[in-house]
Every structure is written in structure tokens, then in C-alpha cells.
Amino acid sequence: MLTITSYFGFLLAALTLTLALFIGLNKIRLI
């Protein structure tokens, strides 16, 4: 159970980081 929770947390963090980076690049291109 702990492994599944840890994996899910890692996946969520990776998705959030990717989304933040994507938004950041879009803002840079808009400027």
C-alpha cells in the first residue's frame, strides 16, 4: 500500500511540474 501511495504521489508531482513548466514556456512565448 505504501508503495502505491508513494508512486501516486510521485506521478502527481511529476505531472504538476510538467504542467508548471509548460505554462511557463507559454508565458515566455507570449511576451
Swiss-Prot record:
GO terms for molecular function: electron transporter, transferring electrons within cytochrome b6/f complex of photosystem II activity. InterPro entries: Cyt_b6/f_cplx_su6 (IPR007802). The gene is petL. It comes from Oryza sativa subsp. indica. It comes from the Eukaryota. The chain crosses the membrane at residues 4-24. One of its GO terms (cellular component) is cytochrome b6f complex. Keywords: Chloroplast, Electron transport, Membrane, Photosynthesis, Plastid, Thylakoid, Transmembrane, Transmembrane helix, Transport. GO terms for biological process: photosynthesis. Component of the cytochrome b6-f complex, which mediates electron transfer between photosystem II (PSII) and photosystem I (PSI), cyclic electron flow around PSI, and state transitions. PetL is important for photoautotrophic growth as well as for electron transfer efficiency and stability of the cytochrome b6-f complex. The keyword Transmembrane applies. It is a single-pass membrane protein. This is Cytochrome b6-f complex subunit 6. It is found in: Plastid, Chloroplast thylakoid membrane. Disulfide bonds: none annotated. The 4 large subunits of the cytochrome b6-f complex are cytochrome b6, subunit IV (17 kDa polypeptide, PetD), cytochrome f and the Rieske protein, while the 4 small subunits are PetG, PetL, PetM and PetN. The complex functions as a dimer. SUPFAM superfamilies: PetL subunit of the cytochrome b6f complex (SSF103436). Belongs to the PetL family. HAMAP family: Cytb6_f_PetL.
